């Protein structure tokens, strides 16, 4: 629920395919830089249309500490509300929405290509990661 995030800056990271090479690379890059996000008082929440057990296995496999939420049923409903659902394939697109404490989206980092990762330089710039 969106009210769960009121009062917190949050980075909502949508992913299409847990356990795929591009998504694996992105999740590991986020994991490896999580301290920079925390230093900016920003919570990280990942969302996929995969089922909860798949997301838990993925998080465990890569030692992920931030939550990975299942937008499984109704299928892709949260992704649709954010405007990042691909109807033809039935997946979340690679969009990251950064919100302020009032749940207002202040920045979007995205890749419109399913098989192309987001440019991590955008995260580095936003969060002063060297």
Q: Each predicted region: which residue ranges?
A:
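Chalcogenol-based redox active-site neighborhoods
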Residues: 1-130
């Amino acid at each position: 629920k969106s009210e769960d995030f009121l009062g917190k800056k949050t980075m909502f990271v949508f992913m299409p395919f847990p356990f795929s090479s591009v998504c694996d690379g992105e999740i590991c890059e986020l994991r490896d830089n999580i301290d920079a996000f925390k230093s900016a008082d920003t919570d990280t929440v990942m969302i996929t249309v995969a089922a909860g057990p798949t997301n838990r296995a993925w998080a465990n496999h890569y030692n992920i500490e931030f939550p990975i939420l299942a937008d499984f049923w109704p299928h892709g409903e949260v992704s649709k509300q954010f405007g990042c659902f691909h109807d033809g394939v039935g997946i979340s697109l690679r969009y990251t929405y950064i919100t302020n404490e009032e749940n207002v989206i202040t920045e979007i980092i995205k890749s419109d290509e399913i098989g192309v990762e987001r440019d991590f330089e955008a995260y580095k710039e936003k969060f002063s990661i060297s």
